[in-house]
UniProtKB/Swiss-Prot annotation:
Positions with a binding annotation for (6S)-5,6,7,8-tetrahydrofolate: S114, L115, L116, P117
Database matches in SUPFAM superfamilies: FMT C-terminal domain-like, Formyltransferase
Name used for this protein in its record: Methionyl-tRNA formyltransferase
Taxonomic placement: Bacteria, Pseudomonadati, Pseudomonadota, Betaproteobacteria, Rhodocyclales
Catalytic activity: L-methionyl-tRNA(fMet) + (6R)-10-formyltetrahydrofolate = N-formyl-L-methionyl-tRNA(fMet) + (6S)-5,6,7,8-tetrahydrofolate + H(+)
Family matches, as PROSITE patterns: GART
Function: Attaches a formyl group to the free amino group of methionyl-tRNA(fMet). The formyl group appears to play a dual role in the initiator identity of N-formylmethionyl-tRNA by promoting its recognition by IF2 and preventing the misappropriation of this tRNA by the elongation apparatus.
GO CC annotation terms, alphabetical: cytosol
Length: 316
């Protein structure tokens, strides 16, 4: 006799999590409850907007709870009432107390976008690109009370290409995470998934991205600047100010060149070449306030730039 599919409660908020929820539903698992962050102001009108996970859950007729904390008895009772076999967590944004971790029969599984223990924390994709890592991946882990410190059940690596942005890598990892969590849920009841403790060495922390750190520091070497531009694409977008106008930089590549950091060396249809602490970068896609992203040639027609001009230094 075939065992009934697991009853899976789900906790997540952004698109990364929605991909996993969609895969879980498509695989036929019963999802009695979805937890997601409260609606947040978004868009030009700053109207309250539901998370991608909430939108997906409502479209499937699934009950949604949006607590600001899981530490209260009422929130735990809501989860307990649906009697889940397992709680799947993906980019949820709230801390799970011990009482919640212990509630499901098979505990809580987390989909984390790095090869743990490297890049524990809120922004593993950004930080992997920014640091120049050549690979990252997905780890499915059994959650404990620490920050991404629980034992690992599954792990799969993917390469980081030289042109990968956080946006592109996010989409690949979201698809991989969705595939892996379905496999994990299918294998979980049999006990064949072996929980491996994370290594004591190699742990790093992927701190939340602040808009201030997206300001380009021209004193850095060209490779670091180019990686930062890729890491902060699409959020929050790397920023550099010229003539006191904040410009978003969406694509940059290291090139030969030298000069005072921040100085424009060349400005033509191929791009704006700017000196860095070591070598230079070519800015090939830019955006001024109130406009759209433009290739360098088109950008320069509306915002002329000359060799010798200098971008403002990043605040220290």
């Amino acid at each position: 006799m075939t065992a009934a599919p697991l009853k899976v409660a789900f906790a997540g908020t952004p698109e990364f999590a929605a991909a996993a929820l969609e895969a879980i539903l498509a695989a036929g698992f019963e999802v009695p409850l979805v937890l997601t962050q409260p609606d947040r102001p978004a868009g030009r009108g700053m109207k309250l907007s539901p998370s991608p996970v909430k939108q997906l859950a409502l479209a499937h007729g699934i009950a949604v709870d949006q607590p600001s904390s899981l530490r209260g008895e009422e929130q735990r009772a809501t989860l307990a009432a649906c009697a889940p076999d397992v709680l799947v967590v993906a980019a949820y944004g709230l801390i799970l107390p011990r009482a919640v971790l212990d509630l499901p029969r098979f505990g809580c599984l987390n989909i984390h976008a790095s090869l743990l223990p490297r890049w524990r924390g809120a922004a593993p994709i950004h930080r992997a690109i920014e640091a120049g890592d050549t690979e990252t991946g997905i780890t499915i882990m059994q959650m404990d009370e620490g920050l991404d410190t629980g034992p690992m059940l599954m792990k799969h690596a993917v390469p980081i290409g030289p042109a990968d942005t956080t946006g592109a890598l996010h989409d690949r990892l979201a698809a991989l995470g969705a595939q892996m969590i379905v496999e994990a849920l299918r294998r979980l009841p049999s006990g064949e998934l072996v929980a491996m403790p994370q290594p004591a060495e190699g742990a790093t922390y992927a701190g939340k991205i602040g808009k201030a750190e997206a300001v380009i520091d021209w004193q850095c070497d060209a490779s670091s600047v180019a990686r930062a531009v890729r890491a902060f694409n699409p959020f929050p977008g790397a920023v550099a100010s010229l003539r006191q106008v904040p410009l978003k930089i969406w694509f940059a590549e290291p090139v030969a060149g030298h000069g005072e950091p921040g100085t424009v060396l060349v400005a033509d249809a191929d791009g704006i070449v700017v000196a860095c602490g070591t070598q230079a970068v070519r800015l090939a896609q830019l955006q001024k306030p109130g406009s759209r992203r433009l290739a360098a040639g088109e950008f320069l027609r509306g915002f002329p730039v000359s060799a010798g001009e200098r971008f403002e230094a990043a605040a220290r």
